[in-house]
A protein has these predicted regions:
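Solvent-exposed loop/turn and edge beta-strand elements of beta-rich ligand-binding domains
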Residues: 1-192
């Protein structure tokens, strides 16, 4: 009599955002976690639950005070295959953070495999940091204080005035293209 034992369930994963490992700190970001599995029993229901972790703190990532989780239920046709788990969240306050996806595979509510490696590069997404810029106004008569500039970009429009050195320093800008326009007002009217 021969006995065959089923393969032990395993999962391997790859997390990306539009195929990339880095993303801008946007209000809506969707990480797609592609979970490749093997050793599952065809025709049996499974569930994969995932949670996002903050790599620097090694704690569950909180966005607006809530954990970011997702789960997918599926019934495999074959012992091997893959499923995608989408995690959609607001990343606008997460600039500079690295996020790691952890998953747990369940069969009929019984945990059968856990993938929870905080250092797994295939599971890590980096939120790009914010940038800044410096504007330096020059003039032949050295009159550079109080000159107005408008900086505009995607979802951004703000007016600034130069300091006594003719400079404006702007921090906290999301990556992207910006337009800097000198504005004519009563201070700059002397140049017209």
């Amino acid at each position: 009599v021969e006995f065959t034992t089923p393969d032990k369930p395993e999962i391997k994963t790859e997390a990306t955002v539009n195929g990339e490992k880095e993303v801008d700190p946007l209000e809506e970001v969707t990480i797609i976690d592609t979970v490749s599995y093997s050793g599952l029993v065809p025709g049996k229901p499974y569930k994969i639950s995932g949670i996002l972790m903050d790599k620097s703190t090694r704690e569950k990532l909180l966005v607006d005070g809530k954990e970011v989780t997702a789960e997918v239920e599926f019934t495999p046709e074959n012992a091997t295959g893959s499923v995608e788990i989408p995690f959609t969240f607001n990343a606008s306050t997460l600039a500079g953070k690295s996020i790691v996806v952890f998953e747990t595979l369940y069969q009929e509510d019984v945990e059968v495999f856990v993938h929870a490696d905080i250092n797994d590069k295939s599971q890590t997404i980096t939120i790009r940091g914010l940038g800044g810029l410096v504007i330096k106004k020059t003039a032949e008569d050295n009159f550079v204080e109080g000159i107005s500039f408008l900086i505009t970009g995607k979802d951004y429009s703000k007016k600034f005035k130069t300091d006594k050195n003719g400079e404006i320093r702007v921090e906290g800008l999301a990556p992207g293209e910006y337009t800097v326009t000198e504005i004519s007002d009563k201070v700059t009217a002397r140049y017209e």
